[in-house]
A protein has these predicted regions:
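Extended, low-hydrophobicity, polar/charged segments
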Residues: 5-190
């Protein structure tokens, strides 16, 4: 059984709109919006929605996640970024709200390491298979141990990258934890 997609456009501001692609199980597929992240969720049978917006490379000083929050009209605390860190022994993924920062010391403690540093951006792209600004925690080329910031549990649905810029996945945080076999910890700072 494959997935079919239906698209609905929601007005946001007077001059912008957001396109939501709702995934549902079906015998037919249109082949739209398929990334390794969506394929991983479909194979696992986990419910999710995809949200698309027009990405602009202008004004990126605040980062890709803040751009998503602004264009979608959502609280940046509900949109999460995926960051790859290196503990020396292994690389691990930390998922934190786009409005905050990854606390590397807390991430290291959460995985039982003494310290952690941000992975080289080129290595992050190579190991995940995604471009910066589009790194999804799902469907990565190399699977890493993953920690989700515990603030995600306050929401019934959060957004993470769907595997490319301008393409996010809306998912229940418990479902995300299940899909990733991840743990939670207070790894975000504001």
């Amino acid at each position: 059984m494959q997935t079919a997609y239906s698209y609905v456009t929601f007005p946001q501001r007077s001059h912008e709109s957001m396109m939501v692609c709702v995934s549902r199980k079906s015998k037919k597929t249109t082949g739209k919006a398929s990334t390794p992240a969506t394929v991983a969720l479909e194979r696992a049978g986990i419910e999710f929605r995809t949200v698309e917006y027009e990405h602009s490379s202008e004004h990126m000083d605040d980062g890709y996640g803040i751009e998503a929050a602004e264009k979608l009209g959502l609280d940046p605390k509900r949109i999460f970024k995926t960051l790859l860190a290196d503990t020396g022994a292994e690389r691990v993924v930390g998922i934190v709200p786009v409005s905050g920062h990854l606390d590397l010391k807390a991430l290291a403690a959460a995985v039982g390491a003494k310290k952690a540093s941000m992975a080289d951006p080129r290595r992050a792209q190579r190991e995940t298979g995604y471009v910066l600004g589009g790194i999804s925690p799902l469907g990565q080329r190399t699977q890493h141990r993953t920690v989700l910031d515990s603030s995600a549990l306050a929401y019934s649905e959060i957004l993470v990258s769907g595997g490319k810029r301008g393409f996010d996945i809306a998912i229940n945080p418990q479902a995300l934890l299940t899909a990733l076999k991840a743990t939670t910890a207070d790894i975000g700072t504001w």
